[in-house]
């Protein structure tokens, strides 16, 4: 497989929308929504922290330096952007809580502010969040482009959007996935096991994005072409699909088509199950009750069946499925932005956007779907 970055298809077919977005503390805000309410009792202090100009890992290092707490004793639910104003929850042993107020000034000098203090009986672990609320400010936006943006948002609210991994997953030079494959091939290795695991996960993410883009391509072809043309297309791809199945696929109202054998999942969380009754599952998908999932390959990954598997297998790698420390999983192909709010400020030529996404989903994926950056070919089947 070609490991160079290829344009990823969009869900919707509008032309590129021209505006400026700067990922900065003024124009990009991220607020973590916790998975559960904190009990206000227990051996772990839980602080809500506001930061800017620091990555989550850099923030943890600051806490370690100022409070004397070991980084391993600190708990957090997820990584937050460096170039943004972000809030997130961090847990630390209760004994360090009195030091927080004493070091308020020292923390503020490092762009950290404690917004609240609570207590809980367990340490916060990775993944212990519901999702994130986002705010983005777009600049140099004309009234016409603001109108176009509103129209795209209406589609996203109605149908959702592709759940692509964001570019930050792949590093400054977009080569993390290549390093991950080299680790699997025993061509390179780093001293820190967490770094090795992260780079391997970047390769998983690259395969997932590529599979999702391929599925969007197939969905667009099913929608755009006649039954006869579709039969010829699937025949050329050595994919076995009969005319009755194709009719069912064309009748699906959602732009992302559910295929026989897809691994579905209840949304926003729940159990996996196989898509066997396509008409029924496509209706539930429209209602945002279930979502098809894509492969994050690994030793214990759950694989699709039938037609879905025939497409998915091109995005597997035997080194992932045999790697002892890479268990594998599945990820929503599609997510739904919630609580979407927008405002166009004509005199400033600015467009303000707020929305909520479930954990693991990227604001940059929504930005990509709105903007349709020039040079990204969305019509190439």
Curated annotation (Swiss-Prot):
Coiled coil: none annotated. GO terms for molecular function: RNA binding; tRNA pseudouridine(13) synthase activity. GO terms for cellular component: cytosol. It comes from the Bacteria. One of its GO terms (biological process) is tRNA pseudouridine synthesis. The active site is at residue 81. Keywords: Isomerase, tRNA processing. InterPro entries: PsdUridine_synth_cat_dom_sf (IPR020103), PsdUridine_synth_TruD (IPR001656), PsdUridine_synth_TruD_CS (IPR020119), PsdUridine_synth_TruD_insert (IPR011760), TruD_catalytic (IPR042214), TruD_pseudoU_synthase (IPR050170). Residues 160-335 form the TRUD domain. It catalyses: uridine(13) in tRNA = pseudouridine(13) in tRNA. Its EC number is 5.4.99.27. Belongs to the pseudouridine synthase TruD family. Responsible for synthesis of pseudouridine from uracil-13 in transfer RNAs. PANTHER family: TRNA PSEUDOURIDINE SYNTHASE D (PTHR47811:SF1). This is tRNA pseudouridine synthase D.
């Amino acid at each position: 497989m070609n490991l160079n970055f290829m344009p990823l298809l969009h869900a919707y077919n509008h032309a590129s929308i021209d505006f400026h977005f700067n990922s900065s503390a003024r124009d990009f805000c991220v607020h973590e929504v916790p998975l559960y309410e904190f009990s206000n009792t227990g051996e772990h202090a839980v602080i809500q922290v506001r930061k800017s100009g620091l990555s989550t890992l850099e923030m943890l290092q600051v806490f370690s330096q100022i409070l004397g707490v070991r980084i391993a004793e600190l708990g957090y639910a997820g990584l937050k952007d460096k170039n943004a104003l972000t809030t997130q929850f961090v847990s630390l042993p209760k004994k360090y809580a009195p030091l927080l107020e004493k070091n308020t000034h020292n923390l503020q000098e490092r762009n950290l502010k404690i917004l609240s203090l609570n207590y809980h009986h367990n340490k916060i672990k990775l993944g212990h969040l519901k999702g994130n609320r986002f705010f983005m400010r777009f600049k140099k936006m004309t009234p016409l482009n603001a109108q176009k943006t509103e129209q795209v948002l209406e589609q996203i609210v109605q149908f959702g959007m592709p759940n692509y991994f964001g570019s930050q997953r792949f590093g400054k030079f977009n080569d993390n996935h290549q390093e991950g494959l080299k680790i699997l091939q025993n061509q390179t290795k780093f001293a820190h096991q967490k770094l090795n695991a992260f780079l391997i996960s970047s390769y998983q993410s690259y395969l997932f994005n590529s599979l999702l883009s391929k599925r969007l391509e197939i969905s667009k072809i099913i929608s755009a072409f006649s039954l006869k043309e579709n039969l010829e297309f699937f025949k050329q791809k050595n994919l076995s699909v009969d005319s009755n199945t194709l009719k069912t696929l064309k009748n699906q109202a959602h732009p992302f088509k559910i295929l026989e054998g897809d691994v579905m999942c209840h949304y926003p969380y729940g159990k996996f199950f196989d898509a066997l009754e396509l008409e029924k599952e496509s209706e539930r998908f429209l209602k945002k009750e279930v979502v098809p999932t894509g492969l994050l390959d690994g030793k214990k990954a759950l694989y699709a069946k039938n037609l879905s598997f025939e497409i998915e297998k091109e995005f597997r790698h035997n080194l992932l499925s045999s790697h002892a420390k890479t268990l594998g999983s599945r990820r929503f192909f599609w997510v739904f932005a919630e609580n979407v709010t927008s405002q166009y400020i004509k005199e400033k030529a600015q467009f303000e956007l707020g929305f909520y996404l479930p954990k693991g989903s990227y604001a940059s994926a929504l930005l990509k779907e709105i903007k349709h950056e020039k040079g990204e070919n969305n019509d190439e089947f």
